[in-house]
């Protein structure tokens, strides 16, 4: 919305600053952060009042988690509210990628909200049918990928780019849409699986958002894309503003989610944020790089898959408990140790992901 003020720069020159993506990214970050920080206590009080017992805690989990009983969930509403308000305020309203990303984020957020609602009202870890949930996620992601394909440059439609390999594209044809949808759905559920300890998911999400904000900005700038010899995808630079808004909202949320957490983001937040990361990676043609930058999320969801498959085939478990962050807790690591060490891993993976831009 504020971007439109730049159209008056001919009359009032200082308004030209609203054309700059970097300026609006900073504005989006501070706006979202202030929104969540200011309204956070009120939202937490309201959710605590409405939910009563809060998020159900696993009885088979680490004993230290039992002290978290009564903590409200659905904190993703705080993140989404702050991010969406900021995105609408600071992005170019004519940018198609912004609207597609918002649609995925809010769609996944709605699915997560309903799942959280069922868990809280039933005081059970089981939300609604996993198959139906996946069906809804793929429907939303598939529609988004069709739109992204239409908006992509002619030479990049349905193409999969490979990091490090210069000018190497794989034409997936009709298979690109289901592949890209899988990336988005996979990202959403991987972040969802990771959200099991105070602060564990939100910081890696912010790190990944910062990384993909940089990638989207560079890929969407014809000069930088040419210098780095990466595929130029027009208009994706605006997604850096979206990433800035999410980082700001994440910082505001972390203020209340820092241990001991006053609120959990729940599926409302984790599904939405993962879907957002996936859609940005797909739009920027850096799907494979997402697996590197979001390697922590990949590790978490793969630990669950390995555990389930191993138990069904052999009757034995590979990990003491899945997801893998609980495995380390069962080995004696304190919760802050697990969280901070996983943050360090996320930072390292983000740097590796950024390095792929230059290594050609």
UniProtKB/Swiss-Prot annotation:
EC number(s) reported in the record = 2.7.8.13
Q: Name one Pfam family in it.
A: Glycos_transf_4
Which pathway does it serve?
Cell wall biogenesis; peptidoglycan biosynthesis
Annotated compartments: Cell inner membrane
Q: Which domain of life is it from?
A: Bacteria
Q: Which reaction does it catalyse?
A: UDP-N-acetyl-alpha-D-muramoyl-L-alanyl-gamma-D-glutamyl-meso-2,6-diaminopimeloyl-D-alanyl-D-alanine + di-trans,octa-cis-undecaprenyl phosphate = di-trans,octa-cis-undecaprenyl diphospho-N-acetyl-alpha-D-muramoyl-L-alanyl-D-glutamyl-meso-2,6-diaminopimeloyl-D-alanyl-D-alanine + UMP
Tell whether Endoplasmic reticulum is among the UniProt keywords: no
Among PROSITE patterns, the record links this protein to: MRAY_1, MRAY_2
Q: Which molecular function GO terms apply here?
A: metal ion binding; phospho-N-acetylmuramoyl-pentapeptide-transferase activity; UDP-N-acetylmuramoyl-L-alanyl-D-glutamyl-meso-2,6-diaminopimelyl-D-alanyl-D-alanine:undecaprenyl-phosphate transferase activity
Q: What does this protein do?
A: Catalyzes the initial step of the lipid cycle reactions in the biosynthesis of the cell wall peptidoglycan: transfers peptidoglycan precursor phospho-MurNAc-pentapeptide from UDP-MurNAc-pentapeptide onto the lipid carrier undecaprenyl phosphate, yielding undecaprenyl-pyrophosphoryl-MurNAc-pentapeptide, known as lipid I.
- Which PANTHER family is this protein grouped with? PHOSPHO-N-ACETYLMURAMOYL-PENTAPEPTIDE-TRANSFERASE, PHOSPHO-N-ACETYLMURAMOYL-PENTAPEPTIDE-TRANSFERASE HOMOLOG
Q: What is this protein called?
A: Phospho-N-acetylmuramoyl-pentapeptide-transferase
According to its UniProt entry, this protein's organism is Methylorubrum extorquens (strain CM4 / NCIMB 13688) (Methylobacterium extorquens)
Q: Which gene encodes it?
A: mraY
């Amino acid at each position: 919305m504020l971007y439109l003020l730049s159209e008056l720069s001919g009359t009032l020159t200082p308004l030209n600053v609203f054309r700059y993506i970097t300026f609006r990214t900073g504005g989006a970050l501070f706006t979202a952060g202030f929104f969540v920080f200011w309204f956070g206590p009120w939202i937490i009080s309201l959710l605590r009042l409405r939910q009563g017992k809060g998020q159900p805690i696993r009885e088979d989990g680490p004993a230290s988690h039992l002290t978290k009983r009564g903590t409200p969930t659905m904190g993703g509403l705080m993140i989404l509210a702050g991010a969406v308000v900021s995105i609408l305020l600071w992005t170019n309203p004519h940018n198609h990628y912004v609207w597609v990303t918002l649609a995925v984020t809010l769609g996944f957020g709605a699915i997560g909200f309903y799942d959280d609602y069922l868990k809280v009202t039933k005081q059970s870890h089981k939300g609604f049918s996993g198959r139906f949930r996946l069906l809804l996620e793929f429907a939303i992601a598939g529609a988004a990928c069709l739109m992204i394909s239409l908006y992509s440059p002619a030479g990049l439609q349905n193409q999969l780019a490979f990091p490090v390999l210069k000018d190497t594209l794989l034409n997936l044809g009709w298979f690109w849409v289901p592949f890209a949808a899988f990336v988005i759905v996979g990202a959403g559920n991987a972040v969802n699986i990771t959200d099991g300890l105070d602060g564990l998911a939100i910081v890696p999400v912010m790190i990944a958002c910062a990384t993909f904000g940089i990638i989207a900005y560079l890929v969407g700038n014809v000069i930088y894309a040419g210098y780095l010899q990466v595929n130029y995808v027009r208009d994706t630079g605006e997604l850096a503003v979206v990433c800035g808004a999410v980082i700001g909202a994440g910082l505001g949320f972390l203020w209340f989610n820092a241990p001991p957490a006053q609120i959990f983001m729940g599926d409302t937040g984790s599904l939405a944020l993962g879907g957002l990361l996936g859609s940005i990676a797909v739009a920027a043609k850096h799907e494979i790089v997402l697996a590197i930058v979001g390697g922590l999320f990949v590790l978490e969801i793969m630990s669950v898959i390995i555990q389930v498959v191993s138990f069904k085939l052999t009757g034995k478990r590979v990990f003491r408990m899945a997801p893998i962050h609980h495995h380390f807790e069962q080995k004696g690591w304190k919760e802050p140790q697990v969280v901070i060490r996983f943050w360090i891993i996320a930072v390292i993976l983000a740097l590796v992901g950024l390095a792929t831009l230059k290594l050609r």
